[in-house]
Design a protein with these regions (language model features):
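A conserved structural motif in NAD(P)-dependent oxidoreductases
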Residues: 206-210, 221-232
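Short C-terminal tail/terminal secondary-structure segment
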Residues: 149, 237, 248-270
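Substrate-binding pocket helix/loop in short-chain dehydrogenase/reductase
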Residues: 100-101, 108-113, 217
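Short, small/polar-rich loop/turn modules that mediate ligand/substrate recognition or access, typified
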Residues: 176, 181, 247-249
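Catalytic loop of short-chain dehydrogenase/reductase
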Residues: 140-163, 168-177, 189-190, 258
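Conserved glycine-rich Rossmann-like NAD(P)H-binding loop of the short-chain dehydrogenase/reductase
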Residues: 32-46
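Conserved glycine-rich cofactor-binding loop
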Residues: 9, 16-18
Length: 270
């Protein structure tokens, strides 16, 4: 199937590694020129060079900390200038610390909201006027299934994600008249560079051996495994296609049918 993406342009946040890198690569493979951002310059530039060499597309690395408004504005403006227009905005940067309520500090909660939620708000504040002026666009927000499938160990991510999901649905209602459509993608556990750290945190909080903690997430998923980066990236690329423009104001889980309550019960038995 031709996704009608060849020649399009995209901004992808958190693009130096993990899901963001996978999305940038998958978009470029479909003929999209991409501007990516991250806080660390060296891995960001290495990723851009790697994807550009592989796909022969224009990949623009822009160093930015999306917890800072000035950096966010600079990323959007530089990306727009380098690409000429912004057809697709993929918000992906940011993560929230897992943990139970008594282990989460004020700084943990601030981190959850400042980057994972407010980072998306900042990007949209600057990119949506560009899309309005050019006659339309597509926004895909990577959020997380914690916002719709609560778990006591993921209370901070759940709160930030629920806010992001509400933001996505609300903006779909506001900007439809401008031919801008919105969709949220809610991954469950994904095998990224961060996965080992998340398992270590679960092992700490639940007082489990690392090997046992690593089995908790797969045990809560009917398919028996966590997702791979490429699986999430493929869904995002499909949703970014003009063919999917009517998939608007909605959210899609990609978590293998995970049952979060089962994961909590498995923890409670330990």
């Amino acid at each position: 199937m031709d996704l009608k993406l060849n020649g399009k342009t995209a901004l992808v946040t958190g693009g130096s590694e993990g899901i963001g890198k996978g999305i940038a690569r998958a978009l470029a493979q479909e003929g999209v020129d991409v501007a990516i951002c991250a806080r660390r310059k060296e891995p960001l530039e290495a990723t851009a060079a790697e994807i550009a060499k592989e796909t022969k597309r224009k990949i623009v690395p822009i160093t930015a900390d999306l917890s800072k408004d000035a950096d966010t504005r600079s990323f959007v403006e530089q990306g727009h200038k380098a690409l000429g227009r912004v057809d697709i905005m993929v918000n992906n940067a940011g993560s929230s610390p897992g943990g139970v309520l008594e282990h989460l500090s004020e700084a943990d909660w601030e981190q959850s909201l400042q980057l994972k939620f407010m980072g998306y708000v900042r990007c949209l504040r600057y990119v949506l006027p560009i899309m309005v002026k050019q006659g339309g666009g597509r926004v895909v927000n990577l959020i997380g299934n914690d916002g719709v499938k609560p778990s006591y160990w993921e209370i901070a991510p759940g709160a930030a994600n629920a806010a992001g999901q509400n933001l996505t649905m609300s903006l779909a209602g506001q900007y439809g008249k401008d031919n801008i459509s919105f969709c949220a993608v809610n991954p469950g556990p994904v095998r990224t560079e961060r996965w080992a750290g998340l398992v270590a945190a679960m092992a700490r909080d639940m007082k489990l051996p690392h090997a046992e903690a690593d089995k908790l997430a797969p045990s809560s998923i009917p398919l028996g495994r966590i997702a791979e980066i490429e699986e999430v990236a493929n869904l995002v690329v499909m949703l970014a296609s003009p063919l999917m423009h009517m998939v608007n104001g909605t959210q899609i889980e990609i978590d293998g049918g995970q049952e979060k309550s089962l994961m909590d019960r498995l923890r409670d038995r330990k």
